[in-house]
């Protein structure tokens, strides 16, 4: 059973998948930072200071012992107030679109690379080259 597991792990697809998952997780953090720290603040700047991440609709009552800000999504959420955080959803949707676009670009580049590899004609084997040279010499002589 251990040998079967070792053979399974050593297959290229499993190792490739593991590497892809690790790189994907790291890439997700990069895209989240890009969205949260660059894109959304720029959108906020051009829309007059609009901060999407703090937009929400409160669905329930605020507890009597609540000490946070009634305009803070994080404070209300931590207090257990039911909320619809549509601003946070917009941020996550932008993250998804960025990741999907980059994955599309990578897949497209790989497909183009594979087409270029397929388009190259295969070089003839050495024996075929030798036979062609012999045939050419024989045609010259006779």
UniProtKB/Swiss-Prot annotation:
InterPro entries: Mechanosensitive_channel_CS, MS_channel, MSC/AndL, MscL_channel. Gene3D superfamilies: Large-conductance mechanosensitive channel, MscL, domain 1. GO terms for molecular function: mechanosensitive monoatomic ion channel activity. It is found in: Cell inner membrane. The chain crosses the membrane at residues 14-34, 86-106. It is a multi-pass membrane protein. HAMAP family: MscL (MF_00115). Belongs to the MscL family. This is Large-conductance mechanosensitive channel. It comes from Rhizorhabdus wittichii (strain DSM 6014 / CCUG 31198 / JCM 15750 / NBRC 105917 / EY 4224 / RW1) (Sphingomonas wittichii). The gene is mscL.
